[in-house]
Amino acid sequence: MDYKETAKRLIELLGGKENIISAAHCATRLRLVMKDESKIDQAQVEELDGVKGAFSSSGQYQIIFGTGLVNKVFDAFSKEADIEREEHVNHQDAAKEKLNPAARFAKTLSNIFVPIIPAIVASGLLMGLLGMINAFHWMSKDSALLQLLDMFSSAAFIFLPILIGVSASKEFGSNPYLGAVIGGIMIHPNLLNPWGLAEATPDYMHLFGFDIALLGYQGTVIPVLLAVYVMSKVEKWTRKVVPHAVDLLVTPFVTVIVTGFVAFIAIGPLGRALGSGITVALTYVYDHAGFVAGLIFGGTYSLIVLTGVHHSFHAIEAGLIADIGKNYLLPIWSMANVAQGGAGLAVFFMAKKAKTKEIALPAAFSAFLGITEPVIFGVNLRYRKPFIAAMIGGALGGAYVVFTHVAANAYGLTGIPMIAIAAPFGFSNLIHYLIGMAIAAVSAFIAAFVMKINEDEERKK
């Protein structure tokens, strides 16, 4: 594949360089913010060598190339389109300008939590390894290696406010190191750590007529999000009114001291209550709606993926882990993803065209590994009926994992990789997860076969 020629041809089909505002890429997709999407030749873009699908979502025109390939295409594309790498930082802002307030809020949460996923995944996998070591008695509990693994596995969750502080500061346009400081203040060693001391009673201090609990915010999400948002406003306002000559001295000082007081007096307790309220509400629905909740969430999750809003769920999942120590939403999302793979596999066996088969098989296996965009946009949504079949499979699998109370100890992994973060909750939890995967994939496969596909009738552009 000639990446340079592909990039040149792609630019032509997109309406020329002048129609491209900014470009970036994720693990599988080239993400573009366009001036006028009506100038794009959608049909020809999808026929381009290496393209597995193209669609418009979340204020961006997204072209699926797949893992590895997208990096090489992007390098050639950015050169041919005269897009400087420095402009990539502004890509998210350019995309968000085209969204409505609700979508913009979801996009903001996504931008904050997606960069943190590797840290959470690493901790979750380490917890899985730790759980297996304890379950099978591979090491003595007094082993130095076991104690180190325990520290490694809990670090990301204990210091989560610092990670969020850095990421949220970047998203809100403030200094990420000040964000890290605010996150650090909220988990200071002088504060009682609720992560490991859930039953302990914190001391109180009296300040400005308020009783402030000396309780840390380790593992919390909403308190630090709100605190860093306020910090960004304080920093920007201070920078506007402070003379440039003393900006470096005054702005950080005012920002940290004002945000710190506000965080402990108001934002922290409010954020903790809000986060606990969300957890209680979700747990109530989970406990009382039972498998019906799994049926609905599992069936509709793929529709949510189409909007890009699904990344904002990471904030809720992180809150669940902090509050109750487990994530019962992720297994439901995983069923929806696996079902997309099952439907995509059915398309591979039903398809007559070589290009369809060429796209469907790797895209289906990608979904089994947790990356669904190629199979959703490149295969199932293109022929519509397989997408509906996947929704059916996701609903059935989701109902099963809720009925059997399957949970995970992290977020960000679905499909086969999620086995590692489901295992720590015991053999039964793991077996039910595998059964749920089988139900989702097989039912989606069968439903897609029953519905059939017409390769000459693709989704409407």
Swiss-Prot record:
It is found in: Cell membrane. The keyword Cell cycle does not apply. Its EC number is 2.7.1.211. Coiled coil: none annotated. Induction: Induced by sucrose. Expression is regulated by the antiterminator SacT. Residues 107-461 form the PTS EIIC type-1 domain. GO terms for biological process: phosphoenolpyruvate-dependent sugar phosphotransferase system; trehalose transport. The keyword Acetylation does not apply. GO terms for cellular component: plasma membrane. Gene3D superfamilies: Glucose permease domain IIB (3.30.1360.60). The phosphoenolpyruvate-dependent sugar phosphotransferase system (sugar PTS), a major carbohydrate active transport system, catalyzes the phosphorylation of incoming sugar substrates concomitantly with their translocation across the cell membrane. This system is involved in sucrose transport. The PTS EIIB type-1 domain is phosphorylated by phospho-EIIA on a cysteinyl residue. Then, it transfers the phosphoryl group to the sugar substrate concomitantly with the sugar uptake processed by the PTS EIIC type-1 domain. This is PTS system sucrose-specific EIIBC component. The lineage of its organism: Bacteria, Bacillati, Bacillota, Bacilli, Bacillales.
